[in-house]
UniProtKB/Swiss-Prot annotation:
The modification Phosphoserine is found at residues 10, 113, 333, 341. The gene is CAPRIN1. This is Caprin-1. The modification Asymmetric dimethylarginine is found at residue 697. Glycans are attached at residues 642, 648. Residues 358-379 are annotated as: G3BP1-binding. It comes from Bos taurus.
Length: 708
């Protein structure tokens, strides 16, 4: 038996199962609850926490004992199932196995219940502690507010008006008596003492804080011949009277009235100072506008604000000049003169300034409309409106070709007269004389195409016209030419003829009234022939107006090598030998030709076909359309000058006969545009708009003279 008991005891120790998870969890929960309950609390909270902790400890110990006992019984039961014999004590213990199991379950349930109760108690304790903390803070804030109010009341009691009001009270009922005011004055000395240098600041105000604390607590301690409780009642009566609340409102009202009274004063001052900036702004605008207009036409030093009447007249005139400049048509590449060339120096006399403005207007408004009319609507086969509206002139009178740049050099000079064509009734010659004035150099290299086929007899003296153009090397200008950058866009003329001689002779032939307009921006086709420009030593002195070919013969101008500069390159011309371009290619090319093909891309049909009659333009342009005469015969062609067109000055009858183009070979009308041999197709025809050869505007200088 003893051995069995010892064996069972050893077996229970060795084979006993570990404690269940529930018991260990409860122990851990109890252990965790114990530190949580150690929150520093006073009163019942701490007691409850400690009691709950002890209860949980007892339950945990009982639970561990029941688990051990159950483990031993499990070992006995296992041995008995194996067939081992147990002693009587072991058998009695095995018979109580069910009771031990029930007790263990009850202990676990009780532990769980106490754990939940402990958690609830902890939460309740925390909430209670938080609530008590808030109550204490509210009480402390209330005490602090009371202290601040007490200090304010004690400070205001030093004012005589406040003391009088408190004595009189509201509605005749006094709030404080003289004795109560005296008590408060004495307590004020204790609560807010004067600085005593013999004591530290902390010690001095520690005594003052004790007096305030006792007053707030309402203690029965004696102070100033009375008690703190009595003083507290006096102070509370003052707070309840709301006297200081009404006093504050009254003071705020006075401040508002003062601010309201000062506001209108500031507004009046602002209203008085407001008109001055407006007047200054208006005057400033007027001065700026006047200076802006006068800055273009008169010196700033000559401007005077006192001469208002003269300034107005000058402004009106300058505005008119500006408008006229805007209305004038712009050429293909108009040149922009320098600002000082259009700005004459204003004289002191207003009449002189007005005369200068009129001169400038006359110069700007000269024949510019003539250029515009010649450039527009060139497909129309009727007369040019500019020719119809031209002024009649004598046969010996000169025709002025417009000038693109006309800066007034002399105060007496008007528009310079470039390219004057003189017309004579018998054996007349139509030379394009490029006259140069001061400050201008002409650039007009011209062709002299000739065609000797199908010449008709000359019926009238006016038909005997020879168009010769030669370079006058003797009429070179003494003034310097313009910069090279502006020369391709400037057509400049020289020796001036009589003023205002810009009329056109309506009795002259169409060639005599040709429009000498120079299109610099025209497209340039490539040069395909080596014999582009040929030279001829003798001039053909006949001009046939039958329009069967290129009848008029224009002598080539002698070009000065040092002054002929184009957009593409420098023209190296010969000063001794004139140049002539023939339509039939009958003249052999010469070695010393002055027109290199690579440097003359602008010598094209567009420079030749301009300036002729309207009918000649449609005749010579092979790119107009299918009915332009180059697709079929020319027998049915009729010129535009065959009939007397209304409102036109051309009444010549020598053009009424039909033209014969049968003998005209169009394979090389101009050498620059020989695309191929043969008469069919527009590729052998020039691209120009018809007419006699005209100069390229890209050449910087040219002087022409009449050749006998």
């Amino acid at each position: 038996m003893p051995s069995a008991t010892s064996h069972s005891g050893s077996g229970s120790k060795s084979s006993g199962p570990p404690p269940p998870s529930g018991s260990s969890g409860n122990e851990a929960g109890a252990g965790a609850a114990a530190p949580a309950s150690q929150h520093p609390m006073t009163g019942t909270g701490a007691v409850q926490t400690e009691a709950m902790k002890q209860i949980l400890g007892v339950i945990d110990k009982k639970l561990r004992n029941l688990e051990k006992k159950k483990g031993k019984l499990d070992d006995y039961q296992e041995r008995m199932n194996k067939g081992e014999r147990l002693n009587q004590d072991q058998l009695d213990a095995v018979s109580k196995y069910q009771e031990v199991t029930n007790n263990l379950e009850f202990a676990k349930e009780l532990q769980r219940s106490f754990m939940a109760l402990s958690q609830d108690i902890q939460k309740t304790i925390k909430k209670t502690a938080r609530r008590e903390q808030l109550m204490r803070e509210e009480a402390e804030q209330k005490r602090l507010k009371t202290v601040l109010e007490l200090q304010y009341v004690l400070d205001k009691l030093g004012d005589d008006e406040v003391r009088t009001d408190l004595k009189q009270g509201l509605n005749g009922v006094p709030i404080l008596s003289e004795e109560e005011l005296s008590l408060l004055d004495e307590f004020y000395k204790l609560a807010d003492p004067e600085r005593d240098m013999s004591l530290r600041l902390n010690e001095q105000y520690e005594h003052a804080s004790i007096h305030l604390w006792d007053l707030l607590e309402g203690k029965e301690k004696p102070v100033c011949g009375t008690t703190y409780k009595a003083l507290k009642e006096i102070v509370e009566r003052v707070f309840q009277s709301n006297y200081f609340d009404s006093t504050h409102n009254h003071q705020n009202g006075l401040c508002e009235e003062e601010e309201a009274a000062s506001a209108p004063t500031v507004e009046d001052q602002a209203a008085e100072a407001e008109p001055e900036p407006v007047e200054e702004y208006t005057e400033q605008n007027e001065v700026e506008s006047t200076e802006y207009v006068n800055r273009q036409f008169m010196a700033e030093t000559q401007f005077s604000s006192g001469e208002k009447e003269q300034v107005d007249d000058w402004t009106v005139e300058t505005v008119e000049v500006v408008n006229s400049l805007q209305q004038q048509p712009q050429a293909a590449s108009p040149s922009v003169p320098e600002p000082h060339s259009l700005t004459p120096v204003a004289q002191a006399d207003p009449l002189v300034r007005r005369q200068r403005v009129q001169d400038l207007m006359a110069q700007m408004q000269g024949p510019y409309n003539f250029i515009q009319d010649s450039m527009l609507d060139f497909e129309n086969q009727t007369l040019d409106p500019a020719i119809v509206s031209a002024q009649p002139m004598n046969p010996a009178q000169n025709m002025d070709i417009p000038q693109l740049v006309c800066p007034p050099v002399h105060s007496e000079s008007r528009l310079a007269q470039p390219n004057q064509v003189s017309v004579q009734p018998e054996a007349t010659q139509v030379p394009l004389v490029s006259s140069t004035s001061e400050g201008y150099t002409a650039s007009q290299p011209l062709y002299q195409p000739s065609h000797a086929t199908d010449q008709r007899p000359q019926k009238e003296p006016i038909d005997q016209i020879q168009a010769t153009i030669s370079l006058n090397t003797d009429q070179t200008t003494a003034s310097s030419s313009l910069p090279a950058a502006s020369q391709p866009q400037v057509f400049q003329a020289g020796t001036s003829k009589p003023l205002h001689s810009s009329g056109i002779n309506v009795n002259a032939a169409p060639f005599q009234s040709m429009q000498t307009v120079f299109n610099m921006n025209a497209p340039v086709p490539p040069v395909n022939e080596p014999e582009t420009l040929k030279q001829q030593n003798q001039y053909q002195a006949s001009y046939n107006q039958s329009f069967s070919s290129q009848p008029h013969q224009v002598e080539q101008t002698e070009l000065q090598q040092e002054q002929l500069q184009t957009v593409v390159g420098t023209y190296h011309g010969s000063q001794d030998q004139p140049h002539q371009v023939t339509g039939n290619h009958q003249q052999p090319p010469q070695q010393n030709t002055g027109f290199p093909r690579s440097n003359q891309p602008y010598y094209n049909s567009r420079g030749v076909s301009r300036g002729g009659s309207r009918g000649a333009r449609g005749l010579m342009n092979g790119y107009r359309g299918p009915a332009n005469g180059f697709r079929g015969g020319y027998d049915g062609y009729r010129p535009s000058f065959s009939t007397n067109t209304p409102n036109s000055g051309y009444t010549q009858s020598q053009f009424s006969a039909p033209r014969d183009y049968s003998g005209y070979q169009r394979d090389g009308y101009q050498q620059n545009f020989k695309r191929g041999s043969g008469q069919s197709g527009p590729r052998g025809a020039p691209r120009g708009r018809g007419g006699p050869p005209r100069p390229n505007r890209g050449m910087p200088q040219m002087n022409t003279q009449q050749v006998n």
